[in-house]
Amino acid sequence: MKNEVAISTSHLDAGATGTGLTYKDAGVDIDSGNALVQAIKPLAASTKRPGADASLGGFGAIFDLAAAGYSDPLLITATDGVGTKLKIALDSGIHDSVGIDLVAMCVNDLVVQGGEPLLFLDYFATSRLQVPVASAVVKGIAEGCLQAGCALVGGETAEMPGMYGNNDYDLAGFAVGAVERSQLLTDDRIGLGDVLLGLASSGVHSNGFSLVRRIVERSGLAWDAPAPFAPETTLARALLTPTRIYVKSCLALHRAGLVHGFAHITGGGFWENIPRVLPQGACAHLDGLSWPFPPVFRWLMDQGGVSAHEMARTFNCGIGMVVAVPADKAEAAIALLGEHGETVHRLGTIAARGEGEAVIIDHLDEAFAR
């Protein structure tokens, strides 16, 4: 894989003359690819951090773990995309925020195991490279990396005629993080009686957008119409609000010794994501009345006729990260998270599971009906 953004397709004779074909005739514009590389080099350089210089141009990126302060590190990797949220970006022509989503979906997964994001790479695939669009996307990626404290060390831009609609593109992100072996967060740290805190989301984040788009279609609203749940902005802008990046607040909590575990609430909602970090025989007992149900979710629920249970298994419903903390340290954890800009809600506790479900949410229908 090339560290610089590269054009990746099968080879044609780019030097043909006369009636012979060129690479550009086949739909691949090398000059546009080179122009993109030059446009995004300063963006990548802005994400430089100890251990990585974030300069593009080599065949591979090098990271110095010792320079980053690690002595006995474990590496943690994550990869993800933005899903069909991209369709809203494409339909509305708003491309400057989905890059933040791409980074968020990867780095928020790293922090669940106590990992500090170190470096990030992206894959941008399209049928026809549009430099302004790709530059806007990468600008968002660089902003996400700055928020997460990781270096954007490279990526791949694949211009593949015929693979996508004329102006469509797809994204994938790849993040690498590290944690000292003794600080790895595993499910055996979580115990009965632990308090569950919820960190507020910034909106829908980056999952459930196939349902979101179906609901918008049913509503008959255009993307540039005022959002019914946020009339000060357009529907597209409101739904494209980027995924919140929780890295710095959660790492601060971990380094202070105030956390037993995290669960990133993405696809599958509470029902699918919280059990991924629970020890055998434990359940998460939440009170649905303990946090506010944001207006965007109320509108989606009402407009689509979506049940409360379906909402909670599809969307984050206002909580983007669940945090398990020792009961005697809950207030200290809430205070520290607040100092780092998080809005924190006390959701419930870890209890014995017995024969029941791994996640119990009391008053769910009542809460979502408010």
Swiss-Prot record:
Gene Ontology CC: cytosol
- Which keywords annotate this record? ATP-binding, Cytoplasm, Ligase, Nucleotide-binding, Purine biosynthesis
Q: What is its EC number?
A: 6.3.3.1
Spell out the NCBIfam families in the cross-references.
Answer: purM
Q: Spell out the protein name for this chain.
A: Phosphoribosylformylglycinamidine cyclo-ligase
PANTHER family in alphabetical order = TRIFUNCTIONAL PURINE BIOSYNTHETIC PROTEIN ADENOSINE-3, TRIFUNCTIONAL PURINE BIOSYNTHETIC PROTEIN ADENOSINE-3-RELATED
Family membership, please give it.
Answer: Belongs to the AIR synthase family.
Organism name = Rhodospirillum rubrum (strain ATCC 11170 / ATH 1.1.1 / DSM 467 / LMG 4362 / NCIMB 8255 / S1)
Q: What is its main location?
A: cytoplasm
